[in-house]
Amino acid sequence: MGSLRLSPWTATASAQRGFPSAGPDPEWSGRRARPRCAPRTAPVSASASSSLGAGRLRTGMEHEWLWDCRGGGRDYAREMETAVRVVQVACTLCQRVQDSLLRSSSDAGGRVHAKLDRSPVTVADWGVQAIVSWLLSDSFRDENVSIVAEEDDETLSSSDGAALLESVVDAVNECLVEAPMYGLRSPEKQLSAHDVIQAIRKCSSVGGPKGKFWVLDPVDGTLGFVRGDQYAIALALIEDGEVVLGVLGCPNYPMKKEWLNYHQKYYRLMSNVAPPPSGSWHKGCVMYAQKGCGQAWMQPLVHDFGKLDWHHPREIQVSSIRDPVSATFCEPVEKANSSHSFTAGLAHSVGLRKQPLRVYSMVKYAAIARGDAEIFMKFARAGYKEKIWDHAAGVVIIQEAGGVVTDAGGRPLDFSRGVYLEGLDRGIIACSEALLHQRIVDAVDASWNSSTL
């Protein structure tokens, strides 16, 4: 069993920076305390400081960050530490690309492309995939790093893709040069176009029931990304068919849950009218968890505060709400991705009264893990197959935060059968609480035969 060992500086610094305090708070009351694992600080001696590797960060407070979880069986400290750092770097790239898209929307067509399924793909999708691939391979040189990821290099490698490839290479190098700020090694020289293509191609694993591999969705919710709304960078590690850790980067996730109901353009407008105090946390975070630890964690994005400082992660837990009348349920924004009419019928049958929270990407999983919503339901139309990269990281984070995620038949999601969630029973249901989850599963059984899905 692990232990929570954070320095006394944590609560004070968190409050000063605007990050939710670690102390009692009405928003967090009634949640279960499960002190089993945590990021912890460890003193770094003068003799050891010079020998710290690039992947080990010594902060200004003479501490380095370590992952302390012995509740989950195998020790994944090295993988967890690296994954959180890598996702922090990826978030920086995404924010820069999104800001560029929003500032010059008239030129966005040159940086947003449509895939065969008509979903958009951007410089950020390829850039993040290249960065994550390079950083993981560099951090685990002693291993044969295997990665399952969403994008390929076909468009970039085509005769018409030269200008787009140049933009991707520039974005990648601009971020990798800052890798040491995150406790990671940067390349000795800038990556060439060939290097970037090779990094993207390295993410060609097909998963399966054996072995260890990373699962990456470089920009989950690309439509939300190009619209200036919610999106996520999702990285998970799967070993022998089980998701063992997950990291979600949510660059636009707001401090106040009420802002999830509004498009980010209103958030940006309000931020311009009444900007938050300098150095305070108002949006953007990374959430992470390891299977079996019984805890999930959240910390603000690094760039807001400068150099990476691990003194202010805080535990996140699911909501304690059980009454459907008070529960908030999430569903995808796009009707093509899920049946809004079916979920509306289910919501009515189980007594949900609030309007659905329609959010892009795995931010829906993040909302449940943080206690900002209680239910996520997705029922794709016939013929659609869910991919593992759209769910792996979010599932383990909700589970370790105290929630439940299954298919609509109440069975665990199976990540051992390749890139798709094969054998999925009708849809996916994630809940903060087991009884609420069972009510929805029962309602699906009662309503399914009359649906048109």
What are these regions (language model features)?
Residues 2-18, 30, 34-92, 99, ...:
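Oxyanion/phosphate-interacting regions
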Residues 90, 94, 125, 136, ...:
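Residue-level signal for inorganic ion chemistry
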Residues 97-105:
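Secondary-structure edge/capping motif, primarily at the C-terminal ends of alpha-helices
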Residues 107-212:
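N-terminal assembly/interaction segments in proteins that build large macromolecular machines
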Residues 158-163, 258-261, 301, 343:
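Short aromatic-enriched loop/helix-cap "lid" or pocket-rim segments at secondary-structure transitions
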Residues 194-201, 209-284, 290:
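DPxDG-like acidic metal-binding loop motif
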Residues 293-300:
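Short polybasic amphipathic segments
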